[in-house]
Amino acid sequence: MSSINYPFVTEKAMMLLDENKLQFIVDTRSNKKQILEDVEKMYGFKVKSVRTMTTMKGMKKAVLAFEEPEAAHEIATRIGLM
């Protein structure tokens, strides 16, 4: 079972693409290691860091930074964000 639910698409999330970062809504029970492994397996890019936070609505949001340049743009294009 994947810990990734869906990409989090806002204006701020689109600006983070320039910093090679993507945001996802994830399962509230998943930890940073599970999120990192799932994203690397799903998209084939190395993740540099994972930051998580819980929104005011009770959802868990993960901000992922990628090691390869332009990895976030490539993933966003694959999943139809761009």
From Swiss-Prot:
InterPro entries: Nucleotide-bd_a/b_plait_sf, Ribosomal_uL23, Ribosomal_uL23-like, Ribosomal_uL23/eL15/eS24_sf. Keywords: Ribonucleoprotein, Ribosomal protein, RNA-binding, rRNA-binding. GO terms for cellular component: ribonucleoprotein complex; ribosome. It holds the Pfam family Ribosomal_L23. GO terms for molecular function: rRNA binding; structural constituent of ribosome. GO terms for biological process: translation. Belongs to the universal ribosomal protein uL23 family. NCBIfam families: PRK14548.1, uL23_arch. Part of the 50S ribosomal subunit. Contacts protein L29. Binds to 23S rRNA. One of the proteins that surrounds the polypeptide exit tunnel on the outside of the ribosome. This is Large ribosomal subunit protein uL23.
